[in-house]
């Protein structure tokens, strides 16, 4: 493909006419979906290096929270705070698509800080148990910047199946 062809493909959804769902209704639907799941794919990267990690998450205070022992995702996190999360259902045909891509900013929470301990409590993990781990468990916090939502069911109500939320 030429550069222009890549650009045209990349801009496909930007240039497509959209029938937007009212923002509050969209946010409510998205929150319900996020809350009904607990696993995402976390994409991190820097330079030529890219990593996509399946990981459990919690969502509260408008952010995604993930405990992690470590792993190669931290190669990207060290140098690049920009991340992407994907939450999705099993593919069962184009009429049943349900997924969210979340672009956001990641930060590592200081172990045993008030924020860290608060999240441990929400996850029902005793802080004393976490203190016994060496090294301590890492806590990744992702603040959403943009969510791209693809729910086929939106079409039934006259909206485009693809919706965007900017933060």
Question: Where on the chain are the PLM-derived regions?
Answer:
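Serine-centered coil/turn micro-motif
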Residues: 71-72, 113
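Short, basic/aromatic recognition patches
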Residues: 19-39
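Charged, gly/pro-rich active-site loop segments
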Residues: 1-21, 97-167
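Short beta-strand segments
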Residues: 37-70, 85-89, 98-100
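Short Pro/Gly-enriched beta-strand edge/turn motifs at strand-loop
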Residues: 35-41, 121-124
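Helix-adjacent hinge/juxtasegments
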Residues: 73-107
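Short beta-strand segments in beta-sandwich/barrel cores
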Residues: 40, 64, 83, 106-107, ...
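Charged, amphipathic alpha-helical segments
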Residues: 23-27, 70, 123-125
